[in-house]
Amino acid sequence: MTPLIFVTGGVVSSLGKGIAAASLASILEARGLKVTMMKLDPYINVDPGTMSPFQHGEVYVTDDGAETDLDLGHYERYVRTRLSRKNSVTTGRIYENVIRKERRGDYLGATVQVIPHITDEIRRCIDEATAGFDVALIEIGGTVGDIESLPFLEAIRQVRTERGAEKAMFMHLTLVPYIAAAGELKTKPTQHSVKELRSIGIQPDVLLCRSEQAVPDSERRKIALFTNVSERAVISCPDIDVLYGMPLELRRQGLDELVIDQFKLRDKVAAADLSEWEAVVDAVKHPLDEVTIAVVGKYVDHQDAYKSVAEALKHGGLRQRTKVNLTWLEAQDLEGSDMAALQGIDGILVPGGFGDRGFEGKVQTSKYAREHKVPYFGICYGMQAAVVDYARHVADLDAANSTENDRQSPHPVIGLITEWRTATGEVEKRDEKSDLGGTMRLGLQEQRLKPGTLAREVYGKDVVAERHRHRYEFNNRYRTQLEDAGLVICGKSMDDTLVEMVELPRDTHPWFLACQAHPEFLSTPRDGHPLFIGFVRAAREKKAGGKLLKEARA
């Protein structure tokens, strides 16, 4: 039976439960334990796939094609375990499963209720996702006191009652606000948050106290007294300059020791080796170079919509001790402009998106980068914009477009994928009338790279696998025509049916590459990703006038 650490949040949302949980997971992993993570989200959507990026932020995609909460991105950036559909569960999915069972007659005519049927299904999902691991951390979304979270909190209360403290731990993240007028930290919100938690039968074992500054020992003692938590288990989580330094901070305060002692794992663990995290923090704090990258997107007002892209760019810089400054530009604002906003930029990245709003701005951005020899990296919709630009302005295919935006285009160089083969070999089919949710080409797919291309050089191997999330694809009817016009198709699906990656010849552009997949989902601070590392290096070379004076590695 896998020991479980349940992470809840109190007082306010957005305190960083996911980061705190992932940081602890990374420490436990560094001590030799096999660790997994899970997110329980209280919203009624089956998954975040159809939710607005402005409201929910990024949709993170796993290897098996699950569209999940962006917190799973945090988890995979901190731990080596690759997560799946099992690791992201919503209220919508739970109710969908229960209703399906009820329709099949699995409950033998019983009245289906929140307790025990909904809570039992939650517990079943937890068991399924965590089996076979030394420790599992499970984050419960929302804030204690929300009505939506109650079934999840009741389910984890039952788990603790059944398994005992040696197999289930409660960790509560709460806010300790600093009141500037009084010049002091206030512990009352934390006391009330724990009181709320205890009223539904959950006594925290550990408190993580988020604050602007370190919580002094006197306040920690006060919190311990009023919440019935050991003073040793009241952990200060102040704001820090480098988020990837959180594992080091929690290790310094002995949070992992609390877990090991409560779960009696002493004979399974080794000394914590956090040297990789120390190297990451050192690279952030002591850069040797600096570049500015423009991200031209549709949802830049809510930058969480591009969370993995922003992190992957920073990771690409970390691997060569380079600080990456991001300039966020709204694609729609660039339509019909003189593109002055892109002057002085070292590199341009155009990320994914859906719909016609801002697409012409992305096409103009691709044209600007191509003509001005600025390093260009297109992802998903960014690749489609690059293909449309090339078709219109180089291949003389006037009014070329994607059928997503213009179904009457005389040259639909981007079209709906109607059929493709999944990673498991199954054939999937779609049409214009298919549901939006869960109907895209999703998950990890292999592709073969063309020898002698920039893509092949950057990756350093012939076959690579990337995660996908898209409904439209390069139209094969235009392959030959665009290749004859000079576009290099440098990556194709293993069955040669889908164009995965395009680039410009290096004798016409120093670094212009666009991919249909989402490589940002496989980038981590400790390893980076070949495409992002190569892109940042190209930006450094542009800034240095074509030749780097000094190579730097983290």
UniProtKB/Swiss-Prot annotation:
Mg(2+) binds at D71, E139. GO terms for biological process: 'de novo' CTP biosynthetic process; CTP biosynthetic process; pyrimidine nucleobase biosynthetic process. CDD domains: CTPS_N, GATase1_CTP_Synthase. Residues 1-265 are annotated as: Amidoligase domain. GO terms for cellular component: cytosol. InterPro entries: Class_I_gatase-like, CTP_synthase, CTP_synthase_N, GATASE, GATase1_CTP_Synthase, P-loop_NTPase. GO terms for molecular function: ATP binding; CTP synthase activity; glutaminase activity; identical protein binding; metal ion binding. It comes from the Bacteria. ATP binds at S14, L15, G16, K17, G18, I19, D71. Pathway: Pyrimidine metabolism; CTP biosynthesis via de novo pathway; CTP from UDP: step 2/2. Keywords: ATP-binding, Glutamine amidotransferase, Ligase, Magnesium, Metal-binding, Nucleotide-binding, Pyrimidine biosynthesis. CTP binds at S13, D146, I147, E148, K186, T187, K188, P189, T190, Q191, K222. It holds the Pfam family CTP_synth_N. L-glutamine binds at G353, Y381, G382, M383, Q384, E404, R471. PANTHER family: CTP SYNTHASE, CTP SYNTHASE-RELATED. Catalyzes the ATP-dependent amination of UTP to CTP with either L-glutamine or ammonia as the source of nitrogen. Regulates intracellular CTP levels through interactions with the four ribonucleotide triphosphates. Belongs to the CTP synthase family. This is CTP synthase.
